Amino acid sequence: MQTKVNELLKPRHIEVTSVSDRQAKVVLEPLERGFGHTLGNALRRILLSSIPGAAVVEAEIEGVLHEYTSIEGVQEDVVDILLNLKGIALRMHNRDEATLTLKKKGPGVVTAGDITLDHDVEIVNPEHVIAHLTKNGELSMSLKLGRGRGYQPVTARRSSESEDRPIGRLMLDASFSPIRRVAYKVESARVEQRTDMDRLVIELETNGTVEADDAIRQAAGILQSQLAAFVELQGDESTVTESKQMEIDPILLRPVDDLELTVRSANCLKAENIYYIGDLIQRTEVELLKTPNLGKKSLTEIKDVLASHGLSMGMRLENWPPPGLKDQDKKASG
């Protein structure tokens, strides 16, 4: 087999073996020496952290105000019930949130199959046990579902959500990942006379909401999209310039007239060729006070108006002004 010196051998054989409905083994070969660990470790980390999934994120149980309590007629306490809710394997199609209900009277076992399903929501492990009810036991709850990636503890979501949460609505640490276990190993492979090649073997187990081979494809796609940014480093400078221009806050491109300043303040700014908010915020207080007819009262007015938009004096902007902005000034003044 003749290959160019700088040409890397690409894998030509991919084998997917289903061990069970939730377990699979994927073999990829041949790989250049060292690429087995490079790709195996990257895919493993992505599979565990970045494959999207659905999970129960909140529960509201009738008669329960907090998780450190028990329910009459239910063998498990509330903490155990919440732990069992985390084990429900869900699929949500074409939606990011859903609310389901569960109502059951004892005696008997409460399972995920007792949950009343909404459209586009599927439970793949209906036999999963949630609680056990005695003869007079009764369990009624409302469950909020959400989509996400990886693991999100309650503390992380509380910081981004409103604190005005009704008493009795219990938040759960959410494990959105449909991947339960991933392991990889690198074996020796041979291609004609070369015996130093790698064979990558990935073994993974899912919760049943995603096929193992599909999860591998998703992980590879994520890795490819992330590495694309490094490939684009070889592009021309215009690509980099355009991306930097997109980072400019749109409010900075608005004329100072949009700030609704007094006529005196607005005229003083225009006399100094300050037409846009992006021009204004780059001036310091000392510079503005040197403007004819602009006193401390006008300066205070300008500072207060900028503060109401989250801006301040003396800010520095890269790539300002953006191309074409001054051309618009000329057209407007002409």
UniProtKB/Swiss-Prot annotation:
Enzyme superclass (EC): transferase
CDD domains reported in the protein's UniProt record: RNAP_alpha_NTD (cd06928)
Keyword tags: DNA-directed RNA polymerase, Nucleotidyltransferase, Transcription, Transferase
Region of interest called Alpha C-terminal domain (alpha-CTD), as start-end residue ranges on this chain: 248-334
Region (Alpha N-terminal domain (alpha-NTD)): 1-234
Highest taxon, organism lineage: Bacteria
Pfam families: RNA_pol_A_bac (PF01000), RNA_pol_A_CTD (PF03118), RNA_pol_L (PF01193)
Presence of the UniProt keyword Transcription in the record: yes
Parts forming coiled coils: none
GO cellular component, one term: DNA-directed RNA polymerase complex
Keyword Ligase: no
A single GO molecular function term of this UniProt record: DNA binding
A Gene Ontology biological process term: DNA-templated transcription
EC number from the UniProt entry: 2.7.7.6
Catalytic activity field: RNA(n) + a ribonucleoside 5'-triphosphate = RNA(n+1) + diphosphate
Written domain comment of the UniProt record: The N-terminal domain is essential for RNAP assembly and basal transcription, whereas the C-terminal domain is involved in interaction with transcriptional regulators and with upstream promoter elements.
Oligomeric form and interacting partners: Homodimer. The RNAP catalytic core consists of 2 alpha, 1 beta, 1 beta' and 1 omega subunit. When a sigma factor is associated with the core the holoenzyme is formed, which can initiate transcription.
Family statement: Belongs to the RNA polymerase alpha chain family.
Purpose: DNA-dependent RNA polymerase catalyzes the transcription of DNA into RNA using the four ribonucleoside triphosphates as substrates.
NCBIfam families xrefs: PRK05182.1-2 (NF003513), PRK05182.2-5 (NF003519), rpoA (TIGR02027)
Protein name: DNA-directed RNA polymerase subunit alpha
Native source organism of the sequence: Thioalkalivibrio sulfidiphilus (strain HL-EbGR7)
